[in-house]
Amino acid sequence: MNEVSYKEISNEEEGQRLDNYLIRILKGVPKSHIYRIIRGGEVRVNKKRAQVSSRLHAGDSIRIPPIRL
């Protein structure tokens, strides 16, 4: 991923933790990198910094930064 992307949470994805959701959609990205970008405030949920253990709700907008490994 070379650019910022936005994902909207569907009813089927509701209730998942943010870290588990990102691990599932960002295949090939190490878990340690995913945790680092969440803790660093680069991942936003509804334009706010999110915690690793945040639960997602239907309609939430997730901002995912460019992934550089």
Where are these regions (language model features)?
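S4-like RNA-binding module at protein N-termini
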Residues: 1-69
